[in-house]
Structures are given as structure tokens and as C-alpha cells.
Amino acid sequence: MHLLARDLHGLDDNEAAVDLGQTPAQIVFLSFSDAELSLLAELHEQNAAPPSLRCASLARLKHPYSVDLYIDKVARHARLVVVRLLGGKDYWAYGVDELATAARMRGFALAIVPGDMHSDERLERASTLSSDALARIWSFFRDGGPDNLRSFLGYAATLAGTPTHWLESAPAPLAGRCEQACRTALGANPPPHAEDEGASGQSSGAQAASAPRALVTFYRSAWLAGDFAPIVALADALHKRGFAVEAYFVASLKDAACETLLAQTIAEFRPDVILNATAFSARTEGGSVLDRADAPVLQIALATSTREAWENSKRGANGADLAMNVVLPEVDGRIFAGAVSFKAQTRARAASEFDEIRHSPEPSQIDHVAALAQNWARLRRLGHSEKRLALVLSDYPARRGRGGYAIGLDTPRSVIAIGDLLRDADYEIGSLYRDGDLVMRALEEAAHYVELPLAEYQRLFATLADDFTRQVLAAWGAPEEDPALAKGAFRFSCIEIGKLVIALQPDRGSRVERRETYHDAELAPRHAYIAFYLWLRHSRSIDALIHLGTHGTLEWLPGKSAMLGPSCAPQVLLGATPLVYPFIVNDPGEAAQAKRRASAVTIGHMTPPLVEAGLAAEAEEIESLLDEYASAATLDPRRAKLVAETILDVAERSGLAQECEVTRDTDRAEALARLDAWLCDVKEMRIGDGLHIFGDGPCGAAEASGLLRALAGRFVEPGPAGAPRADAPTLCRQAAISSASIRAMFRRAPPMISASARRAR
């Protein structure tokens, strides 16, 4: 059977068997790290004298048959096989066991060393070299860098029977300044969309002093391997937007030495925004060192997939990238900004039969991330009275009187509360209705509207991504065909009070199919919907958008699930506008959509206050009869029997018997026990009483603080749905029962729950 080598991993490294097509060599080196493999292949090619070398990625050797084939065709003919295994034996257990067996049968030397800082005794037992030799090999890679890997090649050649000069490994710093990616601000911070760095008219010294500051952090391993082109490209993009940039490499954000250096840098440099390319979560009880800047932390990904795989995928991020660069960093309160690079073959290294793979910058996404950083830094530096904000309300479902509907939130009163909050914080907010019903009536009846002329819309629409506009035209036709177009313009009902505009989110599709299309991941938005966001960004020139309540439609529009691209609808419409999203705390799954697809900062708000459900009249009658039965059971057994019959009659009449699976054939004691248990559960159940007003209740101050901190370009503490922190008992009391479980309880026994409980629905 002949197996073809695959060009590169796809979106997810699948485990199909492959033949790498390599020929035997005296030394074989295997690793999960493309950067490490590429650097070693480059160094070997610089002096391709004997012994020969083969480099291969362990990611290509996941299938057992691939392992068997590689050992048979390449490894068993070698004199020395070195494996650098990230994650311990469990990540490549079959390969470790088979290589260990082959080494002892065929007589080649085997060294399997950890791919990180953590030792694994199982790897040492599988190896055939001495502990000293294994420790030396591990140190070459742990210290890293070209000089140490050059010494490794010399030491490996010596072990393989060709004495070669080598030096003991020299430790490299665990953290440091990456000079190649540091930039001094030479011009002023350009205004949005400005291309001329000198447009402000300030002196160069004043411009440099007033320039925003960005701190970029990335992994030491990329610096040691010289594989940080995306970081340099990002620094250039930030610098073009007026930033002073400091870039630092770190072994880990949790390492004490790295923490110390970053803490000192943050204190001296005082960044307005941080762009972090390290993965996983770095948060401890005391938070992360990056929190000390009290600035937004944009999480960026150096993706492990190829650009082609990403471009052709609806998911966007593969499993590893999603976990490492998206999901886990959310725990630290980072704002996911997207991928800035993808893996690419840069050149073929014939001497080691290895195709060099490095991180290739993705220009469109680097520009998007730089714009996002600029706008968050702008929020941080602008005075509150200068900021232009939009407060957008959901408009679901399609029933009159439900405009601005959000799960668990009293939207009209929350609008008033947020207006008051912003006004008290010195935002330029005019007077607003004091009655929430009047607010909603003004929006629903279009008492005031703004418009985007068709000609202006067509001009802006022509600047959007071609793939996106093709989808829109295919679904909805030309802009002139949109029913919302009136008198040559798209009109939007809104309330303008100073520098705050309040509006209902337009329909993303046809009004009659709102419920069906609300979460449609395939249907492109209609022209009127697009026009609304273009008006906010280009005509209104908002600095930030607040979307109030769970939930809107922007984050559900077509596009990739994570790591969006320039044609994905949420990125096309929102652009690099900071999105702040008050979201109910007990729905983190849907909050994740906004975080991952719209770079939202979610501000968790509490569920409605909880009250006891209570019992309906028939249920109260049964409860009273059960009390009577309990008293009679010991004092008057004959009366107890009659009471029990009455209880069962009432239970049958009310439907409770069926709910508790009680029939006339059920043992009487068992039947009464079931009825009693059910009544106790329902009576003690707590359900929502009314709706929550943003900024009110036990966590109200934290909710308000979270919103104001986000709008000020400061760091927002993470939590459920981006929730404000509260003491555990309060959170337990307030969010003990999710809306889903309450709905399920209502479905189980609607007749037996009191009218007051039903009204709370």
C-alpha cells in the first residue's frame, strides 16, 4: 500500500495514516514544535557535513500505522533518535513505546526528553541513553536559541559516532525585550481613518509624549527560534496608527522572573492597551500580571493551522487554537481579537528532508487588530464628555409590546438607569424620559428618526468585503429592493440625547420571519440592517457601542465560529468598534458568542430577584390533608385511612397524581410519600420575581462599575458572562436556578403552581 505525504495539517490534525516519504539518516529528530524543527533544519543546512539528519513533526505521526511506517523506513536505520515531547508520554504513548522497543531490538540510541519544563520519568525509562546525556540534551532545548541548538547538533553527531566540537548549553533569559518589535512614537496619534501622521499640527516632541502606548507579549520559544515575524508586523501596524510599542518575550506569564520583568515594564511604560500572544490562562488568586496595567488586554492568536485551512473552514479555529487561544484566555478577562498569523511552508530544507514551517503574518487581520487596539486606547484617553456612544436594544420576538426584550432584564428602566449612570460620570448625556414605557413608545412609534441616504449607503457598501456583499445581494437583491427604503434613504427610529444615541436593533431579515431567522448562521443580513451599523460607524462616528441585554443578532450573523476573517458579517458590520455588552450571568454559552465573534466585553448582570413559588389552592389543600394524615396515623388509624383516600382523590382531580406517577395500584404509603416530596420541592422552589434593573440589587454597584470601566478603556474583571464579582453566598442565592430549569419546572406541573408564580414568568 502506497501512502502519499500530506502537504500540511488541516484545520484539525486528523489521524489518517501518512508516509512522510523520508529516507534514512544517521540522526533523527522529532518534535511537535515547528519552530524548533525549522531552526534545527536551518542550522544543519548551514554546515551539512556528516552525520546526516532527518527532522519530522510528531503532529504528522499520530496514527499508529504512520508511526510503524516511519520506524521501519527511517528510525530503525539511525544511530541516534531524539524526541522532544511536549505534554509528556501520554501525548504520544504509542510512538514512545514502539520506539523504545525498536531501539532495544535494533541497537540505535534513543533519547526522549520533555518539550517543556516538566520532567517525566516515563520518558527517561523509555530512553537508552544515560541520565546525564538525557539531561544535557534537554538543557540544549530548554535554554534554546541558535547557539545552543548548534551545540546540540555537535553533541548528537558525537553520540552518533562522528566526534564534533560542541559546548555545554548556555542559559538564555526567560523574559526580555524584543528589540526588533519595539517602536518609538515619532508622530501624533492619528485620528480614526487618518493616514497622515503629522495631521495634528503638534510638535514632534508633544506628539510623541501624547501618543498611545501598546505592550505586546509573546512566547520566548518564538523569539529563540526567530519565528516572530507576526509580532514585528503587528508592531509596524500599531506604529502606523501612532502607537509607541514595547514588545516582550516570556517563557510563561506565571513564571516569577517573567512576572517581575513585566510588572516593572508596566509600571514604567504605562500601556493603554496590551496585546497578548501567549496562550492558556495565566490567572491565579491574585489575578494575572497583565491586570496591573488596568487596561484592555487583547488576546491574539498565532494560529496553528494554515491560512488555506482557516479560509475554507466555517469553524475558523481548530480544536487546539480554540482551547488555548480563545476559551482559556477568557478566564483571564481578555478580549479575543483574532488570529494574526497562520502556519506556512517557507522553504524546503533538502539536507534534512524537511519543509520549514513558520508563522506567516496575515495582513488583513493584523490591520483589524491594530484598529481595535487603537479604538480601545482612544476610549482610555478621551474625556468622558468627548465620547460618542450608542445604546442598542434587542427587538425580539415579533410581538407588539416586546420591543427591547432581553432575558431577565427590565430594558426600559435599565435604559434610564444607564443614562443616569453615564450622566453622573460626566458623559454628555441630555435629559431622557423618566418613564420606561415612554422610552419604548418613542422608539417603537418612530417619534424621531435619522437616515442614511441611499447614495451614501451604496458608496459605503461598495467598500465592504466582496464575499460579504455577494452573499447580501444573492439573498436580498439590490439595496433599492429593501422594503425599509423610504424616500431615497434608510430610516432608523432612535432617541438622541447629547452624545448618546438609543435605538432598537433593526431586523436582520424579513419582519414576518424574525423568530425563525434570529439565529440563522447562513442568512446574510438585509440592507437596512447593514445600513444601521454603517450609519453608527460612519455618520454618527461612535466611539463605543453598548448592546443592552441577552441577546441581539449581530453575533449570530454568518461567518466563522471563532477567529473571524474580513468577510465574516460581525466583523464587516462592527469593524473595530469596541462592544460592551450587559449580559445575564446564567447564560455564559450565548455570551461566548459575543466574546468570540464580536470581541465583546460582557458585563454580567444578575437574574431577577428570586421568591418562593408557593402553592395553588388544590396543592395547599393536599398539603393540609397530609399534615392531618400525619397526625392521625398514630392516634386514629381509621381516620388516617379516610384522609389518605381524600388526598388521592384530590390528587387525581388536580393532575398531581399523574405528575407523581401515582395510580390506585400504587402502595398507599409510597403514593403519599411521593405527593409529599413533590409538594415540598415546589413549595421551596425559588423563581424570578419580575425583572432585573441594570445597576440595581446586591450586585448593582459592581454592574455599574463594570460598564463604566469598560467605557473608560480599563480592565474589567472576568466572571460568569463577564459578571461582576460578588461574594459566593450572594451569587448562590441570586443565580441558583437558571431560567432553563425554571421553565422545565413549569412544564412539569403547570396546574399546581400558584397564580403568582405563573405571573412571574
Regions found by a protein language model. Name each.
Residues M1-R761:
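Ligand/cofactor-recognition surfaces for anionic moieties
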